[in-house]
Amino acid sequence: MEVRALLKTVRVSSKKASLVANLFRHQSTANAISILKNTNKKSAPIFLKILNSAISNAVNNHGLDASKLYVSNVMVNEGPTLKRFQPHSQGRATRILKRTSHLSVMVSER
């Protein structure tokens, strides 16, 4: 049984979040937690929070054994983009795109 936890509209770009997602996909949960704690990226603590939520959902809501869980899938999708303008010289302005993403972590038993 797959149990998932997701977090939507996180203020991190999907390209940068997918770099971290590739590190702990298909790992055991204990190994994934240690990988995320030692990764120096902005999205690593966000993924750690989602992973802990997925583990808690599996144990409390579905009665699965926490020691047998592994990360079965990690999905990173683009969220809505915030569009801002930065003024420049001679009346010009350039667009700044503040990208967001939707993050999802799925765990299941081996």
From Swiss-Prot:
Keyword list, A-Z: Ribonucleoprotein, Ribosomal protein, RNA-binding, rRNA-binding
GO molecular function, one term: structural constituent of ribosome
GO cellular component, as recorded: cytosolic large ribosomal subunit
Name of one Pfam family that matches: Ribosomal_L22
Residue pairs linked by disulfide bridges in the UniProt entry: none
BP-aspect Gene Ontology terms: translation
Membrane-traversing stretches: none
CDD domains: Ribosomal_L22 (cd00336)
SUPFAM superfamilies the UniProt entry points to: Ribosomal protein L22
Family: Belongs to the universal ribosomal protein uL22 family.
Chain's role: This protein binds specifically to 23S rRNA; its binding is stimulated by other ribosomal proteins, e.g. L4, L17, and L20. It is important during the early stages of 50S assembly. It makes multiple contacts with different domains of the 23S rRNA in the assembled 50S subunit and ribosome. The globular domain of the protein is located near the polypeptide exit tunnel on the outside of the subunit, while an extended beta-hairpin is found that lines the wall of the exit tunnel in the center of the 70S ribosome.
Subunit structure: Part of the 50S ribosomal subunit.
Name of this chain's protein: Large ribosomal subunit protein uL22
Species assigned in the record: Mycoplasmopsis pulmonis (strain UAB CTIP) (Mycoplasma pulmonis)
